[in-house]
Amino acid sequence: MSVKIRLMRLGAKKKPFYRVVVSDSRVQRDGKFIEHVGFYDPMVPCGEPGFLKIDAERLSYWLGVGAQPTDRVSWFIKKGFVEVRPAGA
């Protein structure tokens, strides 16, 4: 089973809101998920409170066991919006 850390779209038309979830890569984007690790609201300006909230401890755990982040989740990590620590540190 290949596991991905991806965004699950919620909200209304033209007012998106996303959950950051861990799910099997074979499941559709808005289908079943293993764990909910955070949220992302693109309607809030970048860097302000409420823009992005991810449980860094759980994200580090899932990355440590081999979960692959999608492009957007990787971008959040690279830009420093989420501080990822090595598992067990």
Swiss-Prot record:
The record's section on Gene3D superfamilies has: 3.30.1320.10
UniProt key word Ribosomal protein: yes
Keyword GTP-binding included in the entry's annotation? no
One CC-aspect GO term: small ribosomal subunit
Note the SS bond partners. none
Key words of the record: Ribonucleoprotein, Ribosomal protein
Q: Which InterPro entries match?
A: Ribosomal_bS16 (IPR000307), Ribosomal_bS16_dom_sf (IPR023803)
Which SUPFAM superfamilies does this chain map to? Ribosomal protein S16
A GO molecular function annotation here is: structural constituent of ribosome
Query: Which Pfam families did the record assign?
Result: Ribosomal_S16 (PF00886)
| Entry's Gene Ontology BP terms | translation
The record's listing under NCBIfam families reads: S16
Q: Which family does it belong to?
A: Belongs to the bacterial ribosomal protein bS16 family.
Name of the protein described by the UniProt record:
Small ribosomal subunit protein bS16
Originating organism: Anaplasma marginale (strain Florida)
Gene behind this protein: rpsP
